[in-house]
């Protein structure tokens, strides 16, 4: 068997291609693929790098080992949210309180201003139990005043420090810092999301996917080769996981990274597979409000550098459902779009999301001559909402009845 499943994308990776292109033996190729550090997009082998969250976790673990065991480590093993374990190199350990630093590696084809940035963690004992996580200089602050450290990263740090906390019976305070964070943040789009004072510490899966246009298009076309029924376009790992929980098979889920233009063109024109051209006449789109508001407005490339019509689309959609009063509030709202959406009455929010799904289905069907089903995923406080368009309901029923989605030869 020359294929292993990519733990991030859930599709086969050609081990022989990896071994040949990287000039490594087969066990090394297996390790690189199993950890998620290496993936492929057709004939190309691509390297993933750790997220800011994984680097922060590695720094915290190295600092905690020095504090509790008196050892200085140069590499630490970090468990990723996806479940695999990778080694991360530590650039410096020392200080009082104990501090460690990681210089963030990059990934192939990924234009990322955080590549090469230093991420530091200070660790101190506390009188309480568990792990307390704080933000220091260079880590941004959200409009609500909270540190811009995602929940997934917080869970990753706690998961990787748990054995030390349990073994030594202590509580730990971890402070994450990015010495050049404020300067780097000026080069990012953080301010558009209301993040001030530094960068966000993020990472849903723990590894950064390559995302140049060439790499994204290659990844989309590679994923489409394995689709058995209807391609379900998602925009990231959060929507990918949620789509799986809705019952969409992993092989049918395609991460388009917000590039609906590239994905829909590939779905329509087809991709080479087993000596034939695999085409589809239907597509599912599953996303969160930010991306789908843009898509409803006709922005098929939803990257923030290209299109940021979320607020305008939100205002228009509210008018369309007969709530001009809320449209005015949305136009004046200075915080995050997600915060405004959480403030809405649940019934109004559902009506709004149904309208967004309806527009996406109509637009994609009209512009690309594809039967389209759209569903929207939203997290409101501690609960989750999934709103399905009529096209989605029809196509997913067909899934169950084995009526639709078979690729056309």
Swiss-Prot record:
<keyword id="KW-0169">Cobalamin biosynthesis</keyword>
<protein>
    <recommendedName>
        <fullName>Cobalt-precorrin-5B C(1)-methyltransferase</fullName>
        <ecNumber>2.1.1.195</ecNumber>
    </recommendedName>
</protein>
<dbReference type="InterPro" id="IPR002748">
    <property type="entry name" value="CbiD"/>
</dbReference>
<dbReference type="GO" id="GO:0043780">
    <property type="term" value="F:cobalt-precorrin-5B C1-methyltransferase activity"/>
</dbReference>
<comment type="similarity">
    <text>Belongs to the CbiD family.</text>
</comment>
<dbReference type="GO" id="GO:0032259">
    <property type="term" value="P:methylation"/>
</dbReference>
<keyword id="KW-0808">Transferase</keyword>
<keyword id="KW-0489">Methyltransferase</keyword>
<dbReference type="Pfam" id="PF01888">
    <property type="entry name" value="CbiD"/>
</dbReference>
<keyword id="KW-0949">S-adenosyl-L-methionine</keyword>
<dbReference type="GO" id="GO:0019251">
    <property type="term" value="P:anaerobic cobalamin biosynthetic process"/>
</dbReference>
<dbReference type="InterPro" id="IPR036074">
    <property type="entry name" value="CbiD_sf"/>
</dbReference>
<comment type="pathway">
    <text>Cofactor biosynthesis; adenosylcobalamin biosynthesis; cob(II)yrinate a,c-diamide from sirohydrochlorin (anaerobic route): step 6/10.</text>
</comment>
């Amino acid at each position: 068997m020359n294929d292993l499943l990519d733990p991030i994308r859930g599709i086969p990776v050609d081990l022989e291609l990896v071994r040949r292109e990287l000039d490594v033996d087969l066990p090394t190729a297996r390790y690189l693929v199993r950890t998620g550090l290496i993936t492929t997009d057709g004939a190309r082998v691509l390297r993933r790098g750790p997220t800011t969250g994984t680097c922060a976790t590695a720094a915290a673990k190295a600092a905690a080992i020095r504090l509790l065991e008196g050892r200085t480590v140069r590499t630490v093993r970090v468990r990723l949210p996806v479940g695999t374990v990778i080694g991360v190199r530590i650039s410096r350990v020392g200080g009082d309180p104990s501090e460690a630093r990681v210089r963030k590696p990059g990934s192939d084809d990924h234009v990322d201003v955080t590549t090469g940035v230093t991420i530091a963690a200070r660790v101190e004992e506390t009188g309480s139990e568990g792990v307390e996580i704080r933000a220091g200089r260079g880590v941004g602050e959200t409009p609500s005043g909270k540190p811009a450290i995602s929940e997934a990263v917080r869970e990753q740090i706690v998961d990787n420090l748990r054995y030390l906390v349990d073994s030594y019976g202590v509580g730990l305070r971890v402070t994450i810092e990015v010495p050049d964070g404020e300067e780097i943040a000026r080069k990012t789009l953080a301010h558009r999301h209301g993040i001030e004072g530094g960068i966000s510490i993020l990472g849903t899966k723990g590894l950064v996917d390559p995302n140049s246009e060439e790499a994204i298009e290659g990844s989309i076309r590679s994923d489409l080769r394995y689709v058995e029924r209807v391609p379900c376009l998602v925009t990231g790992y959060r929507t990918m996981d949620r789509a799986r929980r809705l019952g969409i098979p992993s092989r049918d889920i395609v991460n388009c990274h917000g590039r609906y233009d590239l994905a829909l063109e590939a779905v329509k024109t087809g991709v080479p597979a087993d000596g034939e051209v695999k085409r589809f006449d239907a597509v599912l789109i599953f996303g969160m409000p930010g991306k789908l508001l843009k898509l409803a407005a006709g922005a098929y490339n939803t990257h923030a550098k290209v299109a940021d019509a979320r607020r305008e689309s939100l205002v228009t959609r509210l008018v369309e459902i007969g709530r001009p009063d809320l449209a005015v509030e949305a136009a004046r709202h200075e915080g995050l779009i997600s915060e405004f959406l959480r403030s809405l009455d649940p019934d109004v929010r559902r009506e709004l999301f149904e309208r967004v799904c309806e527009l996406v289905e109509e637009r994609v069907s009209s512009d690309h001559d594809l039967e389209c089903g759209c569903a929207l995923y939203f997290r409101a406080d501690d609960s989750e909402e999934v709103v399905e368009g009529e096209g989605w309901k029809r196509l997913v029923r067909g899934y169950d009845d084995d009526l639709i989605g078979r690729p056309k030869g």
